[in-house]
From Swiss-Prot:
It comes from Ehrlichia canis (strain Jake). Its main location: cytoplasm. This is Translation initiation factor IF-2. GO terms for molecular function: GTP binding; GTPase activity; translation initiation factor activity. GO terms for cellular component: cytoplasm. Pfam families: EF-G_D2 (PF22042), GTP_EFTU (PF00009), IF-2 (PF11987), IF2_N (PF04760).
Length: 848
């Protein structure tokens, strides 16, 4: 026994938490839930409270006293079974031990609480209090008094936990609360309640034991009762452990919720912001914001409805957040003015090739680039705008922009002149000055850029260079040969004649212009072309005008598109990490297809990108509303009749084609019919397009895009017309044809005969029966007639019955008599009345 006591003392002094000498696990086990709860608290602990040394010494004294009891019990055991303690003596001893433990526990909890308050400040502390289960293990009588007393010592050690030197404290972010004091009270109350429950169980067991002792049953032993009591005790332990864990989880969830509710955010508020955006910026639910607006009197508010800055500020303050009013216009100005004070460095010239359709612009570029783009164009006509960069000797670079020459691509040519430094005007030597040539000259003058004239196809026998220069003079373009400043270079793209001279002229012009740009700043530039690729998504061709564009930058394009640059490719299709000024690149990563000619700029973050997009979208919507209002006012002034409408859904391969076709068909106007483009977009025809066309009674115009088999089948079922085109000429001509078929023909009345009235046979409600003589032309049954008296039309009608003698006939020629029936019941005067026979001729109208 002394060896056991020494082992206990050494274990306590060394700080170990396990007592293999006392065999705790043999009699009473902590439930798995308590162990998990303890591990959870230890892992999440923030601060550590050391157990006072006085407490450790007191616990050692308690164990020593228990050891003395153990020694005394062993004395009883040595005397034999006749000296075994009675049940009443065991109950009295256990009650005394429990009362002592309760008194000691109160002092320990009070001391621990004092230490916690001194060590942990401004934090909520939750102590890992040992589970108090005053189990009367004396009742587990299996092998004698020695084992019963051993269980008493084991329970005392578990309750007091003398070797637990570190109690972990969970710090909650909401600050201290009243859980510390409450835990102390709850621990004592639980201990007292547990004691009362166990006393009742002991009394019940004592009564049953006395009854069994007085009338014992065969086969029933004390061992069976001990197992029963042990099972009841373990069930009570498990229930209490579950309750403790549930209380801890509830307290944790409540703590996390309160922390979240107390987070204060700084919200940026523009001039206008939607309800959904405001809720997102505050990290609040949209429903909560709607409820707040409902209380303010805003009923039927939707997530996409706009709020002004004043309303948004009130909402932010109501949710205990702070706000800052921002001017997005100033933000955009600051972005574009960033880096203007940095050093300017030379850059490559941007050259736009312009001219009339089929004058050899793309072929000339192919000859310069030594490529073959023209053969890839349908029917040799450029349908898209393209950007390329070539490297000459000495690492000199020239960026070329190829624009379509068809009249429909006016917007593209205007876009080309806005980003260019030099314009190469291509004029065919055999055709001379053409309409799009004149238009290109006007664009150059409006943009105030330098121009070089390239007279192409000089290898033809009918080429006349002097005629070209004189024709240019009529449009204000004076060649150097005539004393002007415009360089005229005769070239042949087919035979590659004078191409080096054209390159040299471009480089010379670039040196005279002293083209420079800032490299070390945020990138900005212009969109040349954009489209949707089935493999890559949105692809936009950009030209950097300022700064350096890098892969990974976040850019804002126009009023509807932004994104992170996932990848860039140069004009040769190679991956590009950076793009410097004057370099054209294809960019992947935008969320929407931007319009050609839209500007782009690099921003710091996606949040800033969304703010800038919202501001630009607000301006764009305001302009649309203004235009719609002006159109409505104009229609009210005209007060025109309702006209027929042709609804169109336009799908193209690139955004430039969309704009060009919209521009072209907008010029097709007629007073009796109206053309509406309900939807325009980039990409293949989809099922949504077909359903929209069915609902709106529209036709689908597909330019250089396809429709898969499922879409075609759906269109056939819904009777939706899908027209495919590859050349812009065809789509414009087809739209004119469709519009012409919708026009009502013009009706014109032509006199084809005349009748002289010889006799009136009868006149009444059924009509008038007249005997007539055909003086001219031919009279047919059902012909339109006019009854004229003194040069005044008194009746218009049709010939119901036409007869010769008694026979019905279809027509009567000039010089013959006939009888007719008119639906006219008033009096007719044969002497003065005449009848003119008319025929209605319809004239089909065609939109040109």
């Amino acid at each position: 026994m002394n060896e056991s006591k020494g082992a206990v003392d050494s274990g306590l002094m060394s700080g170990k938490t396990e007592r293999t000498t006392l065999k705790l696990s043999d009699k009473l086990k902590l439930s798995s839930s308590i162990q998990q709860n303890t591990k959870f608290a230890l892992n999440k602990s923030i601060t550590t409270v050391e157990v006072r040394k006085s407490k450790k010494r007191r616990d050692i004294d308690n164990i020593e006293q228990a050891s003395v009891v153990l020694q005394n019990d062993n004395v009883y055991q040595s005397d034999g079974d006749n000296n075994t303690l009675t049940i009443q003596e065991q109950i009295s001893r256990m009650n005394a031990l429990q009362n002592a433990n309760i008194h000691e526990k109160k002092e320990e909890v009070s001391d621990d609480q004092t230490d916690k308050k001194e060590e942990v400040t401004n934090a909520e502390t939750v102590g890992l209090l040992p589970v108090e289960e005053n189990v009367n293990t004396d009742l587990v009588i299996e092998e004698g008094h020695s084992e019963k007393v051993e269980e008493v010592i084991e329970e005392s050690v578990i309750e007091d936990q003398p070797n637990l030197e570190h109690l972990d404290v969970i710090e909650e972010k909401n600050g201290p609360n009243q859980s510390g004091d409450q835990n102390v009270d709850n621990s004592i109350v639980d201990l007292l309640q547990s004691k009362a429950v166990e006393e009742k169980k002991l009394k019940k067991y004592e009564k049953e034991h006395e009854e069994k002792k007085g009338n014992p049953k065969k086969g029933v032993s004390n061992h069976m009762y001990s197992k029963h009591v042990k099972l009841v005790i373990e069930e009570e332990l498990e229930d209490n452990n579950k309750q403790i864990i549930q209380t801890h989880k509830t307290r944790k969830n409540r703590s996390v919720s309160s922390i979240k509710n107390k987070i204060t955010r700084k919200v940026l508020i523009p001039k206008k912001i939607t309800v959904q955006e405001l809720a997102s910026n505050m990290s609040e639910r949209v429903k909560d914001v709607q409820n707040m607006l409902f209380q303010m009197g805003r009923r039927d508010i939707k997530p996409n409805d706009f709020l002004d800055s004043d309303q948004a500020a009130i909402i932010v303050e109501a949710f205990n957040h702070t706000f800052k009013l921002v001017n997005d216009g100033k933000l955009e100005d600051d972005l574009y003015s960033d880096g203007n004070d940095k050093e300017l460095l030379p850059r490559a010239p941007v050259v736009t090739v312009m001219g009339h359709v089929d004058h050899g612009k793309t072929s000339l570029l192919d000859a310069i680039r030594e490529s073959n783009v023209a053969d890839g164009e349908f029917k040799g006509i450029t349908q898209h705008i393209g950007a390329y960069q070539i490297i000459l000797d000495g690492d000199k670079r020239i960026t070329f922009i190829d624009t379509p020459g068809h009249e429909a691509f006016t917007a593209m040519r205007a876009c080309g002149t806005n980003v260019t430094d030099i314009v190469v005007l291509v004029v065919a030597a055999d055709d001379g000055i053409m309409p799009q040539t004149i238009e290109s000259i006007n664009h150059v003058k409006a943009a105030n850029v330098a121009m070089i004239v390239a007279v192409n196809k000089i290898d033809k026998h009918d080429a006349n260079l002097d005629k070209i220069t004189n024709s240019l003079l009529n449009h204000g373009v004076v060649a150097e040969s005539l004393g002007g400043d415009v360089i005229v270079v005769p070239v042949s793209a087919k035979e590659k004649i004078n191409l080096d001279q054209l390159k040299s002229s471009i480089l010379l012009m670039a040196e005279l212009l002293e083209l420079k740009a800032i490299y070390n700043t945020r990138a900005s530039g212009v969109v040349i072309e954009s489209k949707i690729d089935k493999n890559c998504g949105v692809v936009a061709t950009l030209i950097v005008q300022k700064g350096t564009l890098k892969s990974g930058d976040i850019i804002v394009v126009g009023h509807n598109s932004y994104g992170k640059v996932r990848n860039m490719f140069n004009s040769d299709g190679r991956s590009q990490k950076v793009a410097i000024p004057s370099m054209p690149v294809k960019v992947l990563g935008l969320n929407n297809v931007p319009n050609s000619g839209s500007s782009f700029i690099v921003v710091d973050s996606e949040k800033q990108a969304r703010e800038l997009i919202n501001y630009r979208q607000e301006l764009f919507n305001a302009s649309l509303e203004e235009n719609a209002k002006s159109k409505m006012d104009a229609s009210n002034i005209l007060a025109c009749d309702v006209v027929d409408e042709l609804n169109v859904i336009l799908k193209c391969d690139v955004m430039g084609s969309v704009e060009a076709i919209c521009y072209s068909i907008s010029k097709i106007t007629h007073e009796d019919i109206k053309l509406n483009v309900l939807y325009k977009g980039v990409g293949n025809v989809t099922k949504s397009d077909v359903l929209l066309a069915e609902t709106s009674n529209s036709i689908i115009l597909a330019f250089n895009v396809k429709a898969d088999a499922q879409v075609k089948e759906l269109a056939k079922q819904r009777c939706v017309e899908i027209n495919h085109y590859s050349v812009i000429y065809d789509i414009i001509d087809d739209v004119k044809r469709i519009l012409s078929s919708m026009l009502k023909p013009l009706q014109q009345e032509v006199q084809v005969g005349a009748l002289a009235i010889r006799k009136v046979f009868s006149s009444g409600n059924a009509g008038s029966v007249l005997g007539c003589y055909v003086t001219s032309g031919v009279v047919k049954k059902g012909s339109l007639v006019k009854l004229i008296r003194n040069n005044t039309i008194i009746h218009e009608g049709k010939i119901k019955v036409l007869r010769r003698f008694k026979d019905d006939v279809k027509e009567v020629s000039s010089g013959f008599e006939c009888g007719i029936l008119l639906d006219y019941s008033k009096e007719i005067y044969p002497e003065s009345d005449i009848i003119n026979v008319l025929e209605v001729i319809e004239e089909v109208r065609v939109i040109k």
